[in-house]
Amino acid sequence: MELLRLAALDAEDLGVISAHLQDAILKASDLAYLGGQHRFVLVARRFDWSAEEGAPPRRRLTGMHFDRVLRVRSRGIRPGTESDSPLELLAITFEPTEAPSGTATLVFAGGAAIQLDLECIEVQLKDLGPVWEVEGRPDHEAVAAGRAAIAGNLSEGNTGKGTA
């Protein structure tokens, strides 16, 4: 199967990327804010929802980055820190402010979230190659709790230089 490559320039495009990253697994050390470049990057092990019906469930290593990031805030997670606790990405949402600006929110199971204030939507996703079979499909019972977690205050992360 071919490697997935997607770009998002509007909220609809970002919704497509969110669907492909639903149930992706990553760690805090897989996330970084590159302040000097106004870029937020991540590497995840995404569940391959596009696999043929009847094929064994599998995951793929995927990289993604947001450009034109003005500020990063987080709750329940510190991007770039060493942690063995896996994070499960439930969704990426976008709330417009003054067009074309807005806030993208990465919603994780268990109530963790990262908010990115964006000058505009410029996102790229690319599979990095490896694919492996896994046991079972993701369980979506935590989705409602994770989406409800977007509400409330998020602690402001490092918005200056280096990794947040």
Where is each model-derived feature located?
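Surface-exposed, interaction-prone regions used to assemble/regulate multi-protein complexes
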Residues: 1-164
